[in-house]
């Protein structure tokens, strides 16, 4: 999300937006947050201002569409920016620094401190400062690109009409040629466990705890569970994650990577109970919570007591009170809006992107869909290869992957070869004393084409983008191995793994 903001700000300062050629109507001059007696006329109305919605709105305006973005919350940016990706990364980053200083890491580097104290209020303040700057950045981009921001709960009240209802009951009608639904997702509730965002919390509450709990239980060891569990474990909590599946890291992660990832997290002090289900939770008179668990296949019950219970069992599409039923748009069995390859619903001028449609619930996937969708409205080509959408877990070390896992290739009967390179053999990782993990490359046996990349280690989230580029343009393992990579860098491990996949041997391992 930050990268888009920087690009747009940079382009705007240089005046590029004014030079974009198009054959459409001029941009809207309606001021932001307008509430008028008369309807607003628009070419495109976007409902939701998360990563998919705000990027789509800006792109639509750049293409010459008169654009309105309706957002129910006071701040722009959706879940990702306000209570998701952005604040969690601030806490992950700062808790990692604290963990390094508080443990033996700094001392081993010759940095000695007599006393290290945690100021949780200050840490939360830094998180909020980052969020505020980025939400304000989107508002600035809307103004710069002449996107009309209407604050209110958007409902589709006709195939060419959206009505926004604000908190005081006032309404604004938007008459529009096209409607783009980008309302995102919400936390999936756990049956029988009531979230109070105090001691029984969702990911939202876990980002704003007032103190470090002595003991925390996390339901779910997927991406969100291990990220937020890591934050509080680093800050001093005794954290146990209970996971129904037999591995950590969620859906799509390569099993070899998952096992190594779990081992590293356990070494840091994170505890796991895999193949285990939560059957209930009871709040006691002393404020503590008894969490009942048993084997996923059934068996003897066990109780774990904690101060904070974090529920992280996933997210579900948010389509509440959108007016879909009245329009005859039915949801699929998983609550998603069915769309075609151009992101059109059964009503051709009503589109949907992001978490409300099929595919991974990722901010960058929503961004891509938003851009491609509005380009399609303007007559452009519409194409997205979901196999090239990367996934990242922002723990330390990071985990990132794109393309197929070994398990998927075996299931699909595709013959493949494997190239691996450990960070322990990478010079930059050695100098940084940060050598856990490896790069694993999967290439097609017959063609050498890259089929998947799986990275566990420092900087994995940045490195995976090189793999995504390779997959998007059909590169071979040899193609990557022959690209000169700067030395000493962590990305040399990526080159070496591709060399091992293509040639059978790496140079430095």
Swiss-Prot record:
The modification Phosphoserine is found at residues 285, 297, 502. It is an enzyme of class 1 (oxidoreductase). Residues 1-35 form a transit peptide. Keywords: Acetylation, Cell projection, Cilium, Cytoplasmic vesicle, Disulfide bond, FAD, Flagellum, Flavoprotein, Mitochondrion, NAD, Nucleus, Oxidoreductase, Phosphoprotein, Redox-active center, Transit peptide. It catalyses: N(6)-[(R)-dihydrolipoyl]-L-lysyl-[protein] + NAD(+) = N(6)-[(R)-lipoyl]-L-lysyl-[protein] + NADH + H(+). The record marks 448, 473 as: Important for interaction with PDHX and activity of pyruvate dehydrogenase complex. FAD binds at residues 71-80, 89, 154, 183-185, 355, 361-364. Disulfide bonds join 80-85. One of its GO terms (cellular component) is motile cilium. Its cofactor is FAD. Tyrosine phosphorylated. GO terms for biological process: 2-oxoglutarate metabolic process. Its EC number is 1.8.1.4. NCBIfam families: lipoamide_DH. This is Dihydrolipoyl dehydrogenase, mitochondrial. It comes from Pongo abelii (Sumatran orangutan). The gene is DLD.
């Amino acid at each position: 999300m930050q990268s888009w903001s920087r690009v747009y700000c940079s382009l705007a300062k240089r005046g590029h937006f004014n030079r974009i050629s198009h054959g459409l109507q001029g941009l809207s001059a309606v001021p932001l947050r307008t509430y008028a007696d008369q309807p607003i006329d628009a070419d495109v109305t976007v409902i939701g201002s998360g990563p998919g919605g705000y990027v789509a709105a800006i792109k639509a305006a750049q293409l010459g569409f008169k654009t309105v973005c309706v957002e129910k919350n006071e701040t722009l940016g959706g879940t990702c920016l306000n209570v998701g990706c952005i604040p969690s990364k601030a806490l992950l980053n700062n808790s990692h620094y604290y963990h390094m200083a508080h443990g033996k890491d700094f001392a081993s580097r010759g940095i000695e401190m007599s006393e290290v104290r945690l100021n949780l209020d200050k840490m939360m303040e830094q998180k909020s400062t980052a969020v505020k700057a980025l939400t304000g950045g989107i508002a600035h981009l809307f103004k710069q690109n002449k996107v009309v921001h209407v604050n209110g709960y958007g409902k589709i009240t006709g195939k060419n009409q959206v009505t926004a209802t604000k908190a005081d009951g006032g309404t604004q009608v938007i008459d529009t040629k096209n409607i783009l639904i980008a309302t995102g997702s919400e936390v999936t509730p756990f049956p029988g466990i009531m979230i109070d965002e105090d001691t029984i919390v969702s990911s939202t509450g876990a980002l704003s705890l007032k103190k470090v709990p002595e003991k925390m239980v996390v339901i779910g060891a997927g991406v969100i569970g291990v990220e937020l569990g890591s934050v509080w474990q680093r800050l001093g909590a005794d954290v146990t994650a209970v996971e129904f599946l037999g591995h950590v890291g969620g859906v799509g992660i390569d099993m070899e990577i998952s096992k190594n990832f779990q081992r590293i997290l356990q070494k840091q002090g994170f505890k796991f109970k895999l193949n285990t289900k939560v059957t209930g939770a009871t709040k006691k008179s002393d404020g503590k919570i008894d969490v009942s668990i048993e084997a996923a296949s059934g068996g003897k019950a066990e109780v774990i007591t904690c101060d904070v219970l974090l529920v992280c069992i996933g997210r579900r599409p948010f389509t509440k009170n959108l007016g879909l039923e009245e329009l005859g748009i039915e949801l699929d069995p998983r609550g998603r809006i069915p769309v075609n390859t151009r992101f059109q619903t059964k009503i051709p001028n009503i589109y949907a992107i992001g978490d409300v449609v099929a595919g991974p619930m990722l901010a960058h996937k929503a961004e891509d869909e938003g851009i491609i969708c509005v380009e399609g409205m303007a007559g452009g080509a519409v194409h997205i290869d979901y196999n090239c959408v990367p996934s990242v877990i922002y723990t330390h070390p990071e985990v990132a992957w794109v393309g197929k896992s070994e398990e998927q290739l075996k299931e699909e009967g595709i013959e493949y070869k494997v190239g691996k390179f450990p960070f322990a053999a990478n010079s930059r990782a050695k100098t940084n004393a940060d050598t856990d993990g490896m790069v694993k490359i999967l290439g097609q046996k017959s063609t050498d084409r890259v089929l998947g990349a799986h990275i566990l280690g420092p900087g994995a989230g940045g490195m995976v983008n090189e793999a995504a580029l390779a997959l998007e343009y059909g590169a071979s393992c040899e193609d990557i191995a022959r690209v000169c990579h700067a030395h000493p860098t962590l990305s040399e491990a990526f080159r070496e793994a591709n060399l091992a996949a293509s040639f059978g041997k790496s140079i430095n391992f």
